[in-house]
Swiss-Prot record:
Protein known as: GTPase Der
One MF annotation (Gene Ontology) recorded for this entry: ribosome binding
Record key words, sorted: GTP-binding, Nucleotide-binding, Repeat, Ribosome biogenesis
Gene: der
Binding site for GTP 2: 185-192, 232-236, 297-300
Span of domain EngA-type G: 3-167, 179-352
Assembly and interaction partners: Associates with the 50S ribosomal subunit.
GO BP terms: ribosome biogenesis
Length: 465
């Protein structure tokens, strides 16, 4: 499972700014006014691709246990209780306060691994700021300015050194022969009903009440000689609808399930079409780079007209993931199950395929000769060679020159070309473009004796004029 890092501190010390810097998003609202963040906000930090982790932003602890402030403080304490590592954030400009002292006393009772993060050090004397907070007795201290992204790398290094390695938890299975499938979607789209149908038993509680499933539950299945691990997840609601603390933890567990699966099955309700929340869940799957199958549930109850309307809506709303197969199913009556598994197999095979360097270079050469990159302001990108960069999703690292001016349209052309050539379906495809450093940059080219003599003759000729 991905480890969890919690940001904790009093109001307006910059926790949300740090959250946005780590997750490379603007999901957390940032404002100078204290108390903007009230609920827990989960995201994934992938700044270090070798060690991703889930980070949770919390509301400021204001010392008031009543009303909204008290609820916010309880949310922050719950997040710290879940965390593998706590980042205790303080304000370097304002210095230590009595409220910081209270939070520190509570953190010591909690006995979680904790790193002191001094934010807003820009425009201050860093040494004097560190000296002021030295009375807290932390051996691990990171000073940064999140608003200017100064010190974020130092924070990542400190977090990486303190985090536990990913464990082979309940959802994660190291058996390479077993396919890990996560069923995700909004509440009450039929995820538990589908898993029960596949298992042939009432293993999951299925109800018409949205939010029946509160945790991610993993069960093993053998079907047609293949091994699977099915992960039934809690429905992800819009953030404004997520109220109970247990539901917030369910959302966190669902994000973990997406990160740890190999194939994500996004379930849609044919009676409701594609909603904004469906698009948000799809975004989480794409961010994780997971293979994708779209399962449209309750298809059997639709008329021909309703089906035509649903097909048109799908093509418009999900056109940007046209590489993912869409399967029409009925979890309640069992129709479409074979087609669903066939789509899962194709997506899994594409996502985990191992490419050789020779075959991808041959593909790049053909793509380059068929359609060379266009000239941009007199500059033409040169694609030298490519090599595989990993699987799930398939990643290709392209080396060349002037790649910074390579148009996005040409990058899409390469993606589509590789998809078609290698028959990749149901999986994102990533390209990483790297420019080689010029080994002669900054070096003077020494002239030979003959070149020196020629230069002198030219200079005499110029002076003679």
């Amino acid at each position: 499972m991905l480890p969890l890092v919690a940001l904790v501190g009093r109001p307006n010390v910059g926790k949300s700014t740090i959250f946005n810097a780590l997750t490379r998003t603007r999901d957390a609202l940032v404002h100078d006014q204290p108390g903007v963040t009230r609920d827990r906000n989960y995201g994934v930090c992938r700044l270090d691709e070798q060690q991703p982790f889930i980070v949770v932003d919390t509301g400021g602890i204001a010392g008031d246990e009543e009303g909204l402030a008290g609820a916010t403080a309880r949310q922050a304490r719950a997040a710290a209780g879940e965390a593998d590592l706590v980042l205790f954030v303080v304000d370097g400009r304002e210095g230590a306060s009595s409220l910081d002292d209270e939070i520190l006393a509570w953190l010591r009772k909690l006995a979680r691994p904790t790193v002191l993060v001094i934010n807003k050090i820009d425009g201050t004397d860093e040494e004097s700021v560190r000296s002021e907070f030295s009375r807290y007795g932390f051996s691990d201290v990171v000073a940064l300015s999140a608003a200017h992204r100064q010190g974020i790398d130092d924070l990542l290094e400190e977090v990486g050194a303190r985090l536990p390695e990913e464990g082979a938890g309940e959802l994660l299975d190291n058996d390479p022969a077993r396919v890990r499938i996560a069923f995700v979607g909004r509440p009450n789209v039929g995820k538990s009903t589908l898993v029960n149908r596949l298992l042939g038993e009432e293993r999951m509680i299925a109800s018409e009440v949205p939010g029946t499933t509160r945790d991610s539950i993993a069960v093993d299945l053998e079907r047609d000689g293949r091994q699977y691990r099915l992960i039934d997840t809690a429905g992800l609601r819009r953030r404004g609808k997520v109220e109970e603390a247990v539901e917030k933890f369910s959302a966190f567990k669902t994000l973990q399930a997406i990160e740890q699966c190999q194939v994500a099955v996004l379930m849609l309700d044919a009676t409701e079409g594609v909603t904004d929340q469906d698009a948000t869940i799809l975004g989480a799957i794409l961010d994780a780079g997971r293979a994708l199958v779209v399962a449209i549930n309750k298809w059997d109850g639709q008329s021909d007209y309703q089906r035509a309307q649903a097909e048109d809506l799908l093509s418009r709303k999900l056109g940007f993931v046209n590489w993912a197969e869409a399967v029409r199913i009925s979890a309640l009556h069992g129709s479409g199950m074979r087609e669903l598994f066939q789509a899962i197999h194709r997506a899994h095979a594409s996502a985990t395929h191992e490419f050789s360097t020779s075959e991808v270079n041959q593909a790049l050469e053909i793509a380059y000769e068929t359609n060379p990159p266009p000239s941009i302001r007199g500059h033409v990108s040169k694609l030298r060679y490519v090599h595989p960069g990993g699987a799930n999703p398939p990643t290709f690292i392209v080396h060349g020159t002037r790649l910074k001016v390579l148009p996005e349209s040409y990058k899409r052309y390469l993606e589509n070309f590789f998809r078609k050539r290698f028959k990749l379906v149901g999986t994102p495809v990533r390209f990483i473009f790297r420019e080689g450093a010029n080994p002669y940059e900054g070096k003077k080219n020494p002239l030979s004796d003959r070149q020196i003599a020629r230069k002198r003759r030219l200079m005499r000729h110029v002076k003679g004029k």
